[in-house]
Amino acid sequence: MGGGGQLTEPGEQGSGRAGGVYTWEEVQSHSSRNDQWLVIDRKVYNITQWAKRHPGGIRVISHCCGEDATDAFAAFHPDQRYVRKFMKPLLLGELTPSEPSQDHDKNAALMEDFRDLRKRLESQGLFRTSPLFFILYLGHILLLEALSVALLWNFGNGWIISLLLSVLLATSQAQAGWLQHDFGHLSVFKNSTWDHLMHKFIIGHLKGASANWWNHRHFQHHAKPNIVSKDPDVNMLNILVLGNILPVEYGIKKVKHMPYNHQHRYFFLVGPPLLLPLYFNLHVIQTMYLQRDWVDFAWFLSYYARFFMFYSPYYGILGSLVLITFVRFLESHWFVWVTQMNHIPMDIDHDKHDDWLSMQLKATCNIEHSQFNDWFSGHLNFQIEHHLFPMMPRHNYSRASPQVRELCEKYGIQYQVKGLWESWCDIVRSLKKSGELWLDAYLHK
């Protein structure tokens, strides 16, 4: 789920009766690693063998097995009619007429209203892109890159100039990070092929990372946000314990990789400074090597070739490596505080099989709308709208927001909006609370 593209070869068959009828109990019994069914629009599909070739990755689609994946399917696939052609060989049948369309006793009215909201937003043109927005956005990133080189050409590599160009490069890298995010979600072009190509250019050539690595992690996060064992962004046991449930579970099991009761303090040392220059950088290289992803590796190398071409004449090879590391160090602070402010303070739990709207609202919150916040966060201050509609161009989030809030109010679902500083403080408060829960369970349970 996620990524679109050709899904299966003609003639590949799902096992079972193509015209069969099934109950939810039967579907839910096929949710193991080696036996996977799912439901989309009441049709039952066997994805067991094919999941390995899913364009969005095996894990993201496997996370939805045994349940209704209709809303996830709509969220991740821009051309559903095209994709459905390749799903036909996987079709087993349909739910029995007596079965509801929703699983796990989900609120049918809420789900129907959410789907109506999506159709209404589509009819309002909120899934249509403004080309000028993205042209100007890419332009300001390239301008920052050009200014940093121009500083060197005209003023040399003194300390003040080096610090100034480091800030310019960190800003361009952070903004390129938000832009690759847009292309990765297929939210810019009508033809997803161009999104994929631009994604590789932005994340590979402009940032020195891997598109496939990012997709594999990020689609899982979107499909099951803040859900243990399914969202890789909350799998931090070796460093942090998050939420209210996991700290108690780990404390009872006497798991102690770190003094978690102090995590709100050491977070400032191991989180914002090191995530990009150390963990992500090494993980990108490891993933490309293990997956033999030579295309992304070529894009990755093109970034470093360009960087050394411009900067090694002034800093040398070693000095250029120091410069890259310092730029990533600066960018990492920006990235961590922005990406975690919407999620760490929210619910983190095992999968409760909630409907799409409820699941996303439990795991996300918004930050106040302003021109600065929009630019600074790459419009991730509208995290709720982004998670509900990941293919919506971000310049339309502010128009969708009032309608999403109205639907949430109708069903008593909390729609949280915070100030920027408040959201950052909530990260630290949440880490402190989780650490205290772990310590209490570790010592007394």
UniProtKB/Swiss-Prot annotation:
The chain crosses the membrane at residues 132-152, 159-179, 266-286, 307-327. It is a multi-pass membrane protein. A motif (Histidine box-2) lies at residues 218-222. SUPFAM superfamilies: Cytochrome b5-like heme/steroid binding domain. Pathway: Lipid metabolism; polyunsaturated fatty acid biosynthesis. A motif (Histidine box-1) lies at residues 181-185. The histidine box domains may contain the active site and/or be involved in metal ion binding. This is Fatty acid desaturase 2.
